């Protein structure tokens, strides 16, 4: 970086800070499903009420990320994440004191969702991608995604322990305090746009968006990422309650989320390495098809604790392994200059899927008393996503032919 104010921010420091931001930012929000039963029981709300709030949160995350990405691409991720951390903490605090559904929609949905968008690990990953060469970029993106999964491993049992020891309200207050740690970590990221040479340097934001939206592969990638959001958000929010519904104790649900995160550390990192050696779009097709197969097996086989843990482990390998590959395709085809913005657009589709996965999960459960319809929908969407990714053209644009990812 040519900016002397950023000289002390070495690539290693930026990568470490980015990974820690992913651990806390993603880890904290991945545990909200653990609060479904205690919070709705205390407030007398239905699962649909809770689900709609978290669906709004996912939607705000999706709507906010392109904006956060555009600001980060222009001014750097540091200030964006700092502001987001404050919103995030205020929102989680508000979840603990909201006594009406409308206030819960505001705090858990709008405020927390916006905070999550402005602290998203993809912002940190974009900063990480800019401080390494193209030959290491896919691996670094895998490392950042794996760090987010480590957050899920840490926060799932931690949050369940907070709930068991202090009650759900105090547990949320503790999580709000932990989120504030993002503020000093954000200060370790570059505070202004990196000035490294890039074939995109003369391109405007509007030009980048127009170019991407007219690219068939970008549109297909965006469509496919909808399915990832549908799967991940539904399981994150509703799986702990599903586990209790089939007669297993609550700790099985908490540990299942932790196992998903644990195995996703390996899955995300390995997918990043695979993205350097194999076709990224073909790897994505395999991942989505494998998800459909695993969910089908879970539905048809007996629901014992051991089997649920096995399902969680396999699903964990497939969990966010889509992220380094999806991000990698965007960087490979369009370059890194507007990576945060362009991935934000793709991620909006992911979050629309998340909104539907979370909200429909609660709505269909309240209507039918079962999650089976949502699981089968997940199988169908997994097959569709596998088909959608196959024809993507992942070759760099003509102006980027000298760059490799």
What is each stretch, according to the model?
Residues 86-99, 290-303:
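C-terminal ends and interior cores of transmembrane alpha-helices
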Residues 64-76, 268-279, 366:
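Helix-to-loop junctions at the C-terminal end of transmembrane segments
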Residues 32-36, 216-269:
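Extracytoplasmic gate region of multi-pass secondary transporters
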Residues 103-119, 226, 307-321:
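Hydrophobic core of transmembrane alpha-helices in multi-pass small-molecule transporters
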Residues 108-146, 335:
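Cytoplasmic helix-loop-helix junction between adjacent transmembrane helices
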């Amino acid at each position: 970086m040519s900016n002397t104010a950023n000289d002390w921010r070495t690539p290693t420091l930026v990568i470490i800070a980015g990974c820690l931001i992913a651990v806390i930012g993603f880890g904290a929000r991945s545990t909200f499903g653990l609060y479904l039963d205690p919070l709705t029981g205390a407030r007398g709300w239905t699962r649909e009420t809770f689900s709609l709030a978290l669906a709004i949160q996912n939607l705000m995350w999706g709507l906010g990320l392109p904006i956060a990405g555009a600001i980060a691409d222009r001014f750097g991720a540091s200030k964006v994440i700092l502001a987001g951390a404050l919103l995030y903490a205020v929102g989680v605090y508000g979840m603990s004191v909201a006594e009406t559904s409308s206030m819960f929609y505001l705090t858990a949905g709008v405020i927390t969702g916006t905070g999550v968008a402005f602290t998203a690990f993809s912002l940190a990953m974009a900063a990480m991608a800019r401080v390494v060469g193209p030959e290491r970029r896919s691996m670094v993106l895998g490392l950042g995604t794996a760090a987010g999964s480590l957050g899920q491993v840490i926060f799932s049992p931690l949050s369940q322990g907070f709930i068991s020891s202090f009650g759900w309200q105090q547990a949320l207050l503790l999580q709000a305090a932990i989120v504030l740690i993002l503020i000093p970590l954000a200060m370790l990221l570059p505070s202004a746009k990196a000035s490294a040479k890039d074939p995109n340097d003369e391109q405007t934001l509007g030009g980048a968006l127009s170019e991407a939206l007219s690219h068939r592969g970008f549109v297909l990638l965006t469509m496919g990422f909808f399915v990832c959001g549908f799967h991940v958000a539904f399981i994150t929010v509703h799986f702990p309650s599903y586990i209790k519904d089939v007669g297993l104790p609550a700790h099985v649900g908490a540990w299942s989320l932790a196992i998903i995160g644990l195995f996703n550390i390996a899955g995300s990192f390995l997918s990043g390495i695979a993205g350097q050696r194999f076709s990224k779009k073909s790897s994505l097709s395999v991942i989505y098809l494998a998800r459909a197969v695993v969910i089908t097996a879970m539905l048809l086989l007996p629901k014992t604790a051991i089997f649920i843990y096995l399902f969680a482990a396999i699903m964990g390998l497939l969990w966010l392994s889509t992220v380094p590959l999806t991000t990698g395709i965007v960087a490979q085809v369009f370059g890194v200059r507007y990576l945060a913005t362009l991935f934000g657009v793709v991620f909006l589709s992911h979050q629309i899927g998340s909104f539907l996965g979370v909200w429909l999960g609660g709505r269909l459960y309240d209507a039918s008393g079962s999650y089976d319809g949502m699981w089968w929908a997940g199988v169908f969407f997994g097959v569709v996503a596998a088909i959608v990714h196959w024809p993507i053209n992942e070759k760099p644009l003509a102006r980027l032919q000298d760059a490799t990812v």
